[in-house]
Amino acid sequence: MPRITRRRTLSANTISPQPRRSSGRVLIDLLKITLYATILLIFSSTLIARYEIEQTSMEPNFHPGQRIIVSQAGRAYGSWLSGSAYAAHPSSAAAIGLQREQIVVFYETDDQSEPPLIKRLIGLPGDLVAIHDGGVFINNRRVPEPYLSVPTDCSAYCSLTLGADEYYFLGDNRPVSHDSRQFGPVPGNRVIGRVVMRFWPLDQLTIFS
């Protein structure tokens, strides 16, 4: 049982002596702090990642030099649940929680030594994606894209139905963007995560849902 001691009333000039802590106790406390800090660092680095934008393909909404934070929570959560229902497609929409029009960072190929791309998610698994007449259509309905200033052209991968673990991405700067119109749909295991914050420059700080 913990002991309870009665608090003494001290005068204004009285100094209550503090018990001296042994060097062993101090060392244990330092080790605890170091352990907690290490766990926090590993946890945060698993769930989020920071990137600097180097591409113009998302202008005018994102510019080179801006810095963003990407949530990797879905990717990490899916990998932690190995052996469960997520194991078949650990990076599926259910695991990552991706939604259309979110800004997503992903790898174009399986070579993850190459810099990732940042694009807008247009099509989810099972969607019928079609690009014609200057617009993008999902399941035969035209997608409103108020963030665009020019029509959308396409010469390849212009009409397709996405597979069970495939995603279709487009850049906002359509005339210069290298995206799913050129390299096709992206499998879920290449997705890093969605952009949740632009934190630099500070005057352009933005939170993304």
Model-derived segments and spans:
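Extended hydrophobic leader/signal-anchor segments used for secretion and membrane insertion
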Residues: 1-209
